[in-house]
Design a protein with these regions (language model features):
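Membrane-interface segments at or immediately adjacent to transmembrane helices
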Residues: 1-55
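Solvent-exposed soluble domains appended to multi-pass membrane proteins
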Residues: 37-48, 56, 61-435, 439-515
Length: 515
């Protein structure tokens, strides 16, 4: 089928009649069409549910491994939810690694099968152009779009790629107050994500799309025993080292399963409708073969489509690139050329052949599907949900020049700059930092910067620069409201923070902001 035939088919055969009428009127660009489109979207916005995707790192059911003997079920919550809600197998484009490619399929509806061998679109085409995606499509219906990831922002280039996928905000580990809650391998635990997801929902009046990428289940899994007195024990593997790897893995995904319970419990009482799709991005890096698995398939995990408003339960197996279209279809959303295509053509003749042609047209061709012009503008994505603010300075000790830096939304990745130079900083809590060893002058200028956890350690965002004389608690330049909210703290709290952080954030020479 030619590209133009696909476009005609999308308009005339595979769209709902109402949608086809809207497309035809839009092509004529009549004034009346704009009014109809606005009215249609206003109707769509009413009572639209929040749509959440939770991509669980290396999460799958280890009881599917033939040779393992596991002392207890590592994922009782996920298994229970699979029985109670829509669920099935989730076909993914990767095994053992390749998180970003499962992510790409789930966000865009495009199949990695039609890219080059070993290609990561995040490292190729998406560095050059925007791309139709669930965030872009839902933004047109009044949704706010958020990404959440408890790892560094620059991993897989997400900080620069997500604006090309239509995200409004990105909360990475650098913007999480609990980013230092680590597992034995140093990955931030997934339990910190519950509050971050709720923050996204609370930050807007309208519906939200939140795509969350977890990290706790990440390898490489240790061959020695790292967990003392593990809750779950594992035997049956060929070597003791492999038993240790599986035992570590099972205990980590058990904690992830507890996080799933905590999150669904929190969302069950949320005052808005919520759909939450949860799935593993790929099998863990354990050298598994087809013969090792009861389901005989390596490129497959499982998903649950949970909700808090009583959707009909369905048992259906899906590919990652089909899931967003399925969710939209379940709630009556028929927008976006790729997603409408899946809704209309899945399980029909030439489905894959035409999908390949459609993807080529959208990413590499002349974009006939969009009348020759890419309609998606790169978003002005903000890092974090809320601004970092610098509100006041408290003198703790004049002897060793110790100060409290007070404000809002600090994290362990916050670092103070004085007159443009990095300064050693100790994180206390989301409203308090400590600096010590330098006497501040009234006219010194301070800011609090969120620094990347990547090797570059570049600045990502910062508070406004403010002069010391305007920040001191007794300054005549401070507003009355700022004075009344100042908290002098205690030396005991300072000592505790310094003991908890014996290694201060290092000062890096010749660093430059990347604003």
């Amino acid at each position: 089928m030619k590209i133009m035939d696909i476009h005609t088919a999308l308009v005339s055969q595979y769209l709902t009649p109402a949608s086809a009428v809207l497309v035809i009127i839009q092509k004529k660009r009549l004034r009346e069409s704009r009014r109809l489109r606005i009215t249609f979207r206003q109707q769509m916005r009413k009572n639209q549910p929040n749509i959440l995707f939770l991509q669980l790192e290396s999460f799958f059911d280890p009881t599917l491994v033939n040779y393992l003997k596991i002392s207890e079920d590592p994922i009782p919550t996920f298994r229970k939810l699979m029985k109670e809600y829509s669920s099935g197998y989730y076909k993914v484009p990767a095994v053992g690694a390749g998180t970003a490619n499962t992510e790409f399929e789930s966000i865009t509806g495009m199949s990695l099968h039609y890219f080059g061998p070993g290609e990561y679109p995040y490292k190729s085409i998406l560095k050059e152009t925007t791309c139709e995606s669930a965030p872009y499509v839902l933004k047109n219906l009044g949704y706010s779009t958020h990404a959440v990831h408890n790892n560094e922002a620059n991993f897989y280039g997400r900080r620069s790629i997500f604006p090309n996928l239509g995200f409004d905000t990105f909360t990475s580990a650098e913007y999480m107050a609990e980013e230092n809650d680590k597992n034995p391998l140093g990955w931030t635990k997934d339990e910190v994500l519950t509050d971050e997801i709720i923050k996204c929902l609370d930050s807007t009046e309208g519906p939200d799309y939140v795509y969350t990428i977890s990290t706790q289940g990440h390898g490489a899994y240790p061959e020695e025993q790292l967990i003392d007195d593990p809750e779950i024990t594992v035997t049956g593997a060929a070597t003791e080292a492999q038993n240790n790897q599986w035992e570590y893995y099972c205990n980590e995904i058990h904690e992830m399963d507890n996080f799933v319970k905590e999150l669904t419990d929190a969302l069950a009482d949320y005052p808005e409708d919520v759909i939450l799709v949860m799935y593993g991005d790929h099998l863990p890096t354990m050298g598994l073969t087809v013969e090792d698995l009861k389901n005989k398939y390596l490129f497959q995990t499982e998903y649950v489509m949970w909700d808090n408003f009583g959707m009909e339960k369905k048992k259906v197996n899906l590919s990652a690139y089909q899931m967003a279209a399925e969710v939209m279809d379940r709630v009556g959303i028929h927008e976006g050329n790729v997603f409408k295509y899946h809704q209309a053509r899945r399980n029909t003749k030439n489905y894959q052949v035409d999908l390949e042609t459609l993807q080529y047209d959208l990413l590499y061709g002349k974009q006939y599907t969009y009348d020759g012009a890419n309609p998606f503008e790169r978003t002005k994505m903000r890092m974090g949900i809320y601004d970092t603010t610098l509100d006041s300075i408290q003198v703790v000790s004049e002897t060793d020049h110790t100060y409290y830096i007070q404000g809002t939304n600090f994290t362990p990745s916050s670092q103070v700059k004085i007159n443009g130079e990095w300064y050693d900083t100790v994180y206390v809590n989301p409203t308090k930092l400590i600096i010590t060893g330098k006497e501040l002058d009234d006219f010194d200028r301070l800011s609090v910067v969120q620094r990347s956890n990547s090797s570059t350690r570049k600045a990502m965002t910062k508070s406004h620069d403010r002069a010391v004389y305007a920040l001191l608690a007794d300054s005549k330049w401070k507003l009355d409201s700022e004075k009344s909210s100042s908290d002098t703290g205690s030396m005991e709290e300072t000592d505790t923070a310094l003991e908890r952080n014996p290694q201060k954030i290092p000062v890096e020479e010749n660093s430059t902001d990347n604003q």
